[in-house]
């Protein structure tokens, strides 16, 4: 769904990150989000005091990225003359907020992660990491949790450093009533939540 090297996002068919993924990211105090809370009807509240990785992953108020040069009037914004469109879109290209048909974002959450903010036509690329150190930590933590061996020592080496880097407090795992997969032990839930937040 991304054209990362082109400095644009959400440019292919129905796109958008799920609300479930957005709700997966914890508050900075380490507590899970209550998706039924009325305050989250305000788009800006969704991002307030949340895991820093959410802000890196999802476009929010104030996000910008450089666009490739506009050769034609954009199909999803047919207002104004071609010259007016070129002038309007020469520096910043917004996601397809008002697209229709196959070009609409079906969730309202646009991908930000991986966008090249310094894009120059034909003169850049965005690297894709093949395997991250964080993934190794998460594999270790999940194996320990699955085997019933997850404890403070494992947390100290795995989840705590990841949360600290994201600016989120570490809280001892407890069952989350809003976790999508109920019936899992709290430690497994916590590691899988962290994996989803870290690697999304």
Model-inferred region functions:
Residues 1-19, 23-200:
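Acidic/polar-rich alpha-helix caps and helix-coil junctions
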């Amino acid at each position: 769904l991304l054209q990362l090297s082109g400095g644009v996002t959400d440019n292919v068919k129905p796109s958008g990150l799920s609300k479930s993924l957005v709700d997966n990211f914890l508050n900075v105090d380490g507590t899970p989000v209550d998706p039924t809370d009325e305050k989250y009807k305000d788009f800006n509240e969704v991002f307030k005091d949340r895991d820093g990785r959410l802000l890196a992953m999802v476009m929010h108020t104030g996000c910008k990225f450089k666009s490739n040069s506009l050769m034609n009037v954009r199909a999803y914004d047919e207002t104004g003359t071609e010259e007016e469109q070129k002038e309007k879109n020469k520096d910043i290209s917004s996601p397809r907020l008002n697209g229709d048909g196959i070009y609409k974002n079906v969730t309202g959450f646009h991908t930000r992660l991986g966008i090249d903010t310094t894009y120059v036509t034909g003169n850049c690329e965005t690297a894709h990491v093949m395997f991250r150190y964080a993934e190794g930590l998460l594999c270790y933590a999940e194996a320990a949790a699955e085997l019933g061996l997850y404890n403070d020592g494992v947390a100290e080496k795995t989840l705590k450093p990841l949360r600290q880097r994201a600016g989120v407090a570490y809280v001892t795992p407890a069952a989350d009533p809003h976790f999508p997969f109920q019936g899992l032990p709290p430690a497994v839930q916590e590691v899988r939540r962290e994996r989803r937040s870290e690697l999304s």
